[in-house]
């Protein structure tokens, strides 16, 4: 029974249920509970993936496409939760958590298996690790680009009211540029 996966799915759902109405109503009292629920989801997600990727014994690592996708979504969620805990990036959290919820559900409930032995080839392990980190970093940069385009569109069409929740466009652009640079460096190292 995938107990940790089910706990993570419930915790991601609770986080989404707290974040989405809070973003629409500009209410910030929900943030602490949303971060707590997201932290529980991340921990349970990590334990669920650990048991799926390392099934035990000398059988190797299960690096199926769904497990790797769920691992990437875990990395993205971890970074975005850390960013959100500093009162930034809240607009992207529903997208990130929904992505993680779907990936974890597919990885848990759909049978998939691709066993490999990375301990025999450390170069391949470094290559896969750097690839996963660069992929996660570039996805975060792409989400910042979507946020930048959405806010720019809303401002040009005079549909977005100014609030303290809306980050400045220049700071989003600067973050996006730095994150893209980090992703390109990681991809080059891969």
Q: Could you say what each language-model-derived stretch is?
A:
Residues 133-158, 186-190:
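Transmembrane alpha-helix/helix-exit interface in multi-pass inner-membrane proteins
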Residues 1-11, 60-73:
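Structural signature of hydrophobic alpha-helical transmembrane segments
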Residues 23-34, 83-92:
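Membrane-interface helix-boundary motifs at transmembrane edges
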Residues 154-190:
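A mid-sequence, solvent-exposed acidic-amphipathic segment
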Residues 84-134:
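Hydrophobic alpha-helical segments and helix pairs
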Residues 1-15, 130-138:
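Hydrophobic transmembrane alpha-helical segments in integral membrane proteins
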Residues 37-53, 105-108:
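A generic, lipid-embedded transmembrane alpha helix
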Residues 27-44, 61-68:
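Loop-to-helix transition at the N-terminal end of transmembrane alpha-helices
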